[in-house]
Amino acid sequence: MIKANLQLFAHKKGVGSTRNGRDSESKRLGVKRGDGQFVKAGNILVRQRGTKIHPGLNVGKGKDDTLFALVDGRVKFSRLGKDRKQVSIIPA
């Protein structure tokens, strides 16, 4: 009687895990309504982190610095000095 000495080996080499392969979900920040566009009260104008763009007439600011329209009207972007921007709503 012949006894077979059968040994099984891995046919693929074991590999370690990587520390890459993750990324956070985008926050969809930016200007949501353009200059001259008609908006209704409550419409979001700008989503931002910090006050890159400041609220002007008829524009409110949320706790996360989101700018939104307080009245119906047209959007108006303007500059305040050299490095400051502002968005206002001109009532229709």
Curated annotation (Swiss-Prot):
Maturation propeptide residues: 1-9
GO annotation, biological process: translation
InterPro entries xrefs: Ribosomal_bL27, Ribosomal_bL27_CS
PTM field: The N-terminus is cleaved by ribosomal processing cysteine protease Prp.
Record's keyword terms, sorted: Ribonucleoprotein, Ribosomal protein
Gene Ontology CC annotations of this record: cytosolic large ribosomal subunit
The keyword Kinase is annotated on this UniProt entry: no
Gene Ontology MF terms in the entry: structural constituent of ribosome
Keyword presence, Ribosomal protein: yes
UniProt similarity note: Belongs to the bacterial ribosomal protein bL27 family.
Protein name according to UniProt: Large ribosomal subunit protein bL27
Encoding gene (name): rpmA
